[in-house]
Amino acid sequence: MRIVIQRVSHASVTIEGVCKSAIKEGFMILVGIENADTQEDANWLCKKIVNLRVFDDENGVMNKSILDINGEILVVSQFTLHASYKKGNRPSYIYAAKPDIAIPLYEYFCKELSNALGKEIGTGEFGADMKVELLNNGPVTICMDTKNKE
């Protein structure tokens, strides 16, 4: 699984002109799933996300987690995170999992992340054409890949 985490002041996702989810301070997370991804990958990411200390403490030091600030999370599926651009100029998405594999794992990830956060999270709609708006705070943007845990 590959994710892009952005620390935001607020974020929302709109589908066909209707706001599906909106959050205030917290994380906007893009998630891409490939065929080899498992629930163990999702569990590892959930633990990392809720404990990631990238919010300022009283001294202006990034020392607080999303749990510490009672922040919110918006998750949006993003198969293009697995784009291959090795040959030519048109990306290939051959590494992105097909919906029959990706949807159950995406739903599992969202459920487990909500459990880890201790409250509901906002989500997009898998496979939909979405408009995502956010105000990146910092900016703070972090990429994680369960196949390359650095």
Name the predicted role of every residue range:
Residues 1-89, 103-150:
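N-terminal, polar/charged subdomain of small-to-medium soluble alpha/beta proteins
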Residues 96-104:
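A short acidic, glycine-rich active-site loop
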